[in-house]
Amino acid sequence: MSSSITMSEPRLNWDVTPKNGLKAFFSPENYKDHSMAPSLKELYILSNRRIGENLSVSASSVENEPAVSSATQAKEKVGMILLPKPRVPYPRFSRFSQREQRTYVDLLAKYAKLPSSSKTVGTNTNEYLQYLDMKKHVNEEVNEFLKFLQNSAKKCAQDYNMLSDEARLFTEQLLRACIEQVKKYPEFYTLHEVTSLMGFFPFKTEMGLKLEKTLLVLGSAKFVKTAFPSMPVKLQLSKEDMSSIETPQQKAEVMHCDISKDPNAEKLVSRYHPQIALTSQALFTLLNNHGPSYKEQWEIPVCVEMIAVEGSKPVKVIYINSPLPRKQMTMRERNQIFHEVPLKHIISKNTSVPVSAVFMDKPEEYTSEVDMPTEAGECRKIETLENLDMDFDGDVTELETFGVTTTSPPRSPSSESDSSAPLMTDVHAVPKIAAVPLAPATPVAPTMPVAPATPVTPTMPMAPATPEASATPNITDDSRSLCQILMKQLQKEKQLFSGVEGGPEGCKNKDDQGLEPCGEEVPSANAKSLTQDNEVHRTEGISKESDVGVLCTNDERQGGQGNANNPNNTATASEAAESEKGIPCGSDTDEDCLIIDTESRSCDGKTADLGSRPNSSAQASAGNQATTTVSEESCVLKKPIKRVYKKFDPVGEILKMQDELLKPVSRKVPELPLTNSEESKQPPASEQPSAALDAAPWPKSSWPSAFQKPKGRLPYELQDYVEDTSEYIAPQEGNFVYKLFSLQDLLLLVRCSIQRVETRPRSKKRKKIRRQFPVYVLPKVEYQGCYGVEALTESELCRFWTESLLHSNCSFYVGHIDAFTSKLFMLEEIASEELKEKLAALKISSLFNILQHILKKLCSLQEGSYLLSHAAEDSSLLIYKTSDGKVTRTAYNLHKAHCDLPGVPSSLSVPWVPLDPSYLLPYHIHHGRVPCTFPPKPLRPAAQAKVGGTRMPTRNHRNPVSMETKSSCLPVQQVENEGVARNKRKIM
């Protein structure tokens, strides 16, 4: 009996392989994780609970509720902010203490999002300087921590290959539906051309995609939901939700809706004639090419068509469709495709609004290229005649020795050494047309000869000769002629600038009013010249620099009608002046004809014509013309006084004071008219006025901007034309927005959409006025939620940048999703200022040059179907063309290349993304832990360490991760499983 019992019982086997504590089942850590006893922190919370806190609860409600221990309730209360367990133990402690980390976390939460010019920074300067100093030291440890995370990702490479069954099923269905869409394109292609992405054109830094017009808006958009009761939020769809969202087949059809077969786009192309029509996804793909790696692989179908135009030859249009599915796709990208669907459903409200009511673009960014910044416009003030020291109502014909001597006393000692006193130039219209204005140039000194000038009007006398040429008779007539020339010149300048300020009608009215010439002889003893020093009056808002004798010439009228009183004297004076110097009449310091162009319309509504340099042939043939426009005059600086007034050039001052109103032109070329004002030489830098008030009223913006609108390239009838939405086909779900952009000399028709809409104040000043604005939410799947928030990649930044180009009024959000739990743990809003700082990491000028080169290359293609192909990590671009029934062995089979699901790239490197140390998660704030830093060294024993949220460092038998840094001061005891375990089985 006993023997049978002993035979049935199993025998004890003591030959157990020693595990040396590596896989010990009953360890202190397992005991703490699975123990039902409350921790010290939970006991502390229970002890501090107010007495009688829950006495008001009725007995019936207590009986109906399940029995839950107080310790469990405390665990639930504290468990939301427990410090997460790292994937790999930390190799060392932080160089900062717990107190220092807590201080920096508080400063980071206060100043991380504030600009340095904010009021908070100004009132707390010392605290802000402390934050900057601590940030400099923290960044040193951040670099070491990021290297630790990169090595941790290599040890945990299986984390990046994780894909749930639900996500795998959805992505397979979607990708197969996209593969079916590929079959609608031609099957065989032959290599047509190979080119570089960058091209061989000169690199242009100032380039941008600029909005010309929003052509058509169709459909509606749902409102966005950005506030949630608690975070994180589980991204899980119920059966009812699955029935309301679109299927993978429907999503694939929307993704590959070709613009070449869009009837709405065809109508718009036939009306506006853009060179290129493309989708927003194609635009993003062409912009998302970042050198020098160019790691993005893509294929884009292109269709080149010729459309008929009434009354003209056919026009070529290039249709760029959405890119085809990728040949290789990482698990991170598959995860993002899957989580994008539930994220859009959770952040969407049931209400929607028509897209036509959405403010998609900012009006203040649609400034023309010739418009000035607001700062320059505010600091320049229009001066009135009351603010000037000059008396324009005085009769200068009664002055003595007019044009011979200068008797005005100088204001400053510097002006006493000048050979002639400067004269103030007025650029504004004088209210009284009969008043005699001051000439824009002072009479020259007696020692300086003045070359003659051609008359301005048929009744004007010619300018007299200089004192050196006074041997000719009728000196009083010459003085009278100079007087009349100066009066008529200033009167014409008054009319010139009043035409700019008053419009075409004002110019016409003042041109019709003529002045009678002076008939009396002006005694030379009473002629005086009005002078003024070269002192700059900053309080009056205008620079009063010295001027020289500037005489207006007319190229069209010479001789017979120029001086009815003494034409011989005028001719003699001209010959004497020219023979004395032996050089022709020049203008300014560069011997160029200076043309005063006010960009105003002449009396008949036409644009003003530019004058030319006077010559002998013009003087002989232009005597028959009796009328001319104001804009045909040209102010000529006399060559003999060039060496004296080289420093004080009145024409240069006019150019700088009236930057765009008075445009200099290049030297006259016999073959080409003087129409290019950009080639004229500018005045020397020494003559630039120091005061900011001398700025032009409409200077051309020179700073590059991707959001700046140029001059309208559309005709006026197309700019004001409003499309009838009833003539177009609206989408069944979602919306379509058709916009016309310009890229240098190319017109682009872009079909885009608005993802979501939000209601917010129209501006900071108009907070009571609320409008609807577009919103774009980017899903971002992250694998390092236990350490912090991952930074935005180049592709994600390019996506935000592309959306900001399409809709400048768009708001941006990033939905941070934990890849392991499928929870939305953070919905971050990116402000416009913050986005501009982030976009500084992109080489925007390089991306624009790549886009322009590709589009220029497409414009050179002939009619047909093409395929743009770019391989990963390749700087070249392949252009394939459809085979016309000829299939060779080198032909590219598009259908065969996309016959199966995209594979996973076989790369040895892990798709690791660095963290952004400026983002604080709730556990960072609660525990006072600086993001992207090692844990601080505990100051107390293990019992107190758990109260602070961390356990005492215990001896770790696992191999630590290498740091690859210069630091070798690793602690003896490693941090073990900080925070809550992943598979914690504690009974709640």
From Swiss-Prot:
Signal sequence, start to end: none
Biased composition regions of type Basic and acidic residues, renumbered to the chain: 534-547
Gene Ontology cellular component terms for the protein in this record: Cajal body; cytosol; euchromatin; histone locus body; nucleus; transcription elongation factor complex
PTM annotation (Phosphothreonine): residues: T589
Tissue expression profile of the protein: Expressed in brain, kidney, liver and testis.
Inducers of expression: Down-regulated during neuronal differentiation, probably by NMDA receptor.
Example GO biological process: positive regulation of transcription by RNA polymerase III
Modified residues (Phosphoserine): S322, S587
Compartments, as annotated in UniProt: Nucleus
Keywords: Nucleus, Phosphoprotein, Transcription, Transcription regulation
Pfam family, one: NARG2_C
Subunit structure: Component of the little elongation complex (LEC), at least composed of ELL (ELL, ELL2 or ELL3), ZC3H8, ICE1 and ICE2. Interacts with ICE1 (via C-terminus domain). Interacts with ELL.
Similarity-based family: Belongs to the ICE2 family.
Task of the protein: Component of the little elongation complex (LEC), a complex required to regulate small nuclear RNA (snRNA) gene transcription by RNA polymerase II and III.
Protein name: Little elongation complex subunit 2
The organism of origin for this protein: Mus musculus
Gene: Ice2
